[in-house]
């Protein structure tokens, strides 16, 4: 578990801040946030005041005129069209938007999304051959196809194809009838940040302009959903689209989105980009990871309320299955890391038989959050391992894999994330090679994560008004991250664990006029380092907490540290006292870790500080007196073990470290 972070507070540029305050009339804290994001006056006007009328001409995209003519001709001749999508949320929403639009034009249109495990990402020849056999006249790809030169070449004489994609364009562009991708070298479209659904939406706009002379602005909520989920920069057109899409989502949303919001428990909330990223998108993604992404498309294209509700419930349940799969694999991976000892000091490489390949990427991300090392999670099936990688800031995981390419069957990706396959009997060799590579390329400081802080705030200045002012910068996302503030000194009035699994922490901070609530997700460890009366520094984002008609500011903790830590000192007599307390707290049966820790803090001897008392649990684990495990409900539990004979404290590394 990461205990420390590097706090990096942005420096001030008062001159630029004052210019923004004077020219744009913004609040000083908003001006500082804009300077931190390198937004000048001209960009600031577009950033704050940009509207749908500022969207770019879709015909500025290369090949758009060719694509429009071909689609129109195919519709007029009543020939069948197939939209070939992808199984992530960007692909799901792109498929949905284009399908809904072409249906409005009267097209004979269906869609095809490959199965994640058996077919993989992008175009595959077998699927295209099947579509040709069925008599498909035109295939329009969304969110894929730009790298499929050979596959397009194999079928281009037998079927018309339009490629719409947003991924980096290779040197060899597929020779389809039209290729719409703003990242092509000879495409002069000004905005290079569109998502896959954004490109598909531009095709819809071009077709509608040609037909009616008007802008097509339907389904912006679906476009916003995919844009946020694909983590593209929320600047330029993306910002305009997402801002308008969120307004639609909160006023008259797509039926499927409304039902998804309902089952996710967000129906009484104002939906933000954060809700999309952390709540709605995972439910759509779960279909592609666990079952099939076509169900998510069906949710977004149906006009039947009963069907939408049923599919939303199904996706919600699928997401729970995904979470359970993820939780189980994560627990096994953590055990693997612990068993590796020092082998995991530089890089995390874990593997398991038949781990679900649809969730190993998520598990890799969680392990990075937990241990902050370049991480590879590998699912082994029939002697072949399929791996997913996630990196840390400043370390190129693709280059690391490339240095080991002689060990791998195949690999691909980019600096932050990658995938690969490998013979299972070479995984240990890969771990050794990557360990050596990391020793040579990662400094000790780079293994400490950075929390980038926009500005310091005195604890007494935090109120709802400042949240309202800062909200002018929403929606947040890539290239416009949620502002992070810091309080450099505050006193803890209370601390408690919360949630069904007691895996989240709530800290109550004192202010001159009352208290502030601060929440730390997935940080139960804080209960052992921060206590009532502890003076802390806190890095956080801000949000409103609405409860029983009352609105108050709430801090979402990014990092929290005591300004001074209690020293851990242990004695034989003190441990005897703690043994009695823990034994009585356990009552001869399993108890949750949280309940036992609460009992320890309540009953500990007066001459022992909190950290020392809680550290006794670590010693009792090392001596085999108690055993930690995960209960059936996912909660961390302690089991009491009957140990015969006299206990030898010198066998406890923790006792030897802190004994006095």
Q: Where do the PLM segments sit?
A:
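Acidic, two-metal ion nucleic-acid-processing modules in DNA metabolism proteins
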Residues: 98, 103, 239-334, 369, ...
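Hydrophobic helix-and-loop "lid/oligomerization" segment in the mid-to-C-terminal part
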Residues: 2-3, 10-137, 158, 208-429, ...
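Short alpha-helices
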Residues: 97, 174-228
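Generic detector of well-ordered alpha-helical packing
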Residues: 87-91, 144, 166-167, 182, ...
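Histidine/acidic-residue-rich, glycine-tolerant segments that coordinate divalent metal ions
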Residues: 142-194
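Histidine-centered active-site/metal-ligand motif
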Residues: 166-167, 182, 356, 414, ...
């Amino acid at each position: 578990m990461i205990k420390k972070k590097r706090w990096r507070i942005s420096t001030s540029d008062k001159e630029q801040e004052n210019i923004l305050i004077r020219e744009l009339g913004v609040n000083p804290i908003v001006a500082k946030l804009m300077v931190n994001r390198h937004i000048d006056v001209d960009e600031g006007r577009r950033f704050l005041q940009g509207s749908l009328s500022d969207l770019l001409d879709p015909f500025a995209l290369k090949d758009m005129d060719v694509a429009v003519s071909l689609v129109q001709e195919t519709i007029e001749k009543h020939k069948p069209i197939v939209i070939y999508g992808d199984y992530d949320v960007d692909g799901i929403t792109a498929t949905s938007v284009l399908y809904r639009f072409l249906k409005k034009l009267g097209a004979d249109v269906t869609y095809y999304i490959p199965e994640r495990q058996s077919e993989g990402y992008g175009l595959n020849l077998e699927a295209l051959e099947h579509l040709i056999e069925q008599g498909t006249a035109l295939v329009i790809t969304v969110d894929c196809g730009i790298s499929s030169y050979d596959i397009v070449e194999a079928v281009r004489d037998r079927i018309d194809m339009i490629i719409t994609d947003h991924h980096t364009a290779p040197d060899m562009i597929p020779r389809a009838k039209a290729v719409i991708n703003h990242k092509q070298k000879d495409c002069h479209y000004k905005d290079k940040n569109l998502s896959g659904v954004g490109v598909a939406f531009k095709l819809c706009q071009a077709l509608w302009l040609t037909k009616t002379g008007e802008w097509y602005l339907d389904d912006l909520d679906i476009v916003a959903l995919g844009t946020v989920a694909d983590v593209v920069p929320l600047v330029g057109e993306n910002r305009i689209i997402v801002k308008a899409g969120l307004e639609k989502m909160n006023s008259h949303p797509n039926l499927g989105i409304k039902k998804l919001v309902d089952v996710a428990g967000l129906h009484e909330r104002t939906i933000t980009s954060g809700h999309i990223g952390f709540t709605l998108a995972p439910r759509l993604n779960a279909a592609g990871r666990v079952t099939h992404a076509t169900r998510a498309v069906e949710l977004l294209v149906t006009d039947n309320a009963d069907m939408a509700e049923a599919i939303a419930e199904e996706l919600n349940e699928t997401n729970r299955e995904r979470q359970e799969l993820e939780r189980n694999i994560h627990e096994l991976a953590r055990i693997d890391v612990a068993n590796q000892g020092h082998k995991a000091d530089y890089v995390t490489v874990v593997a398991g038989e038949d781990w679900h390949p649809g969730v190993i990427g998520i598990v890799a991300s969680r392990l990075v959050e937990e241990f902050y090392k370049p991480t590879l999670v590998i699912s082994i099936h029939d002697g072949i391992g399929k791996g997913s990688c996630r990196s840390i800031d400043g370390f190129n995981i693709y280059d690391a894999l490339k240095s080991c390419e002689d060990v791998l069957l195949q690999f691909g990706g980019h600096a932050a994330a990658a995938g690969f396959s490998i013979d299972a009997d070479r995984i240990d060799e890969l771990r050794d090679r990557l360990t050596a590579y990391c020793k040579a390329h990662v400094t000790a400081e780079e293994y400490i994560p950075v929390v980038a802080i926009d500005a310091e705030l005195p604890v007494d200045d935090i109120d709802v008004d400042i949240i309202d002012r800062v909200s002018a910068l929403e929606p947040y996302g890539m290239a416009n991250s949620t502002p992070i503030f810091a309080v450099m000194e505050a006193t803890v009035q209370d601390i408690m664990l919360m949630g069904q699994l007691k895996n989240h922490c709530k800290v109550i901070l004192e202010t001159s006029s009352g208290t502030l609530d601060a929440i730390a997700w997935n940080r139960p460890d804080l209960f052992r380092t921060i206590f009532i009366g502890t003076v802390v520094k806190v890095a956080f984002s801000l949000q409103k907490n609405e409860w029983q008609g009352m609105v108050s500011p709430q801090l979402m903790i990014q990092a929290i540290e005591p300004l001074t830590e209690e020293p851990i000192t242990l004695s034989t007599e003190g441990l005897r006292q703690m043994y009695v307390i823990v034994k009585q707290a356990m009552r001869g049966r399993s108890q949750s870790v949280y309940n036992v820790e609460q009992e320890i803090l309540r009953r500990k001897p007066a001459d022992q500080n909190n950290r020392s008392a809680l550290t006794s649990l670590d010693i009792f684990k090392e001596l085999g007196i108690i055993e930690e495990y995960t209960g059936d409900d996912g909660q961390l539990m302690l089991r009491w073990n009957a140990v015969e004979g006299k206990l030898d404290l010198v066998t406890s590394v923790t006792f030897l470290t802190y004994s006095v």
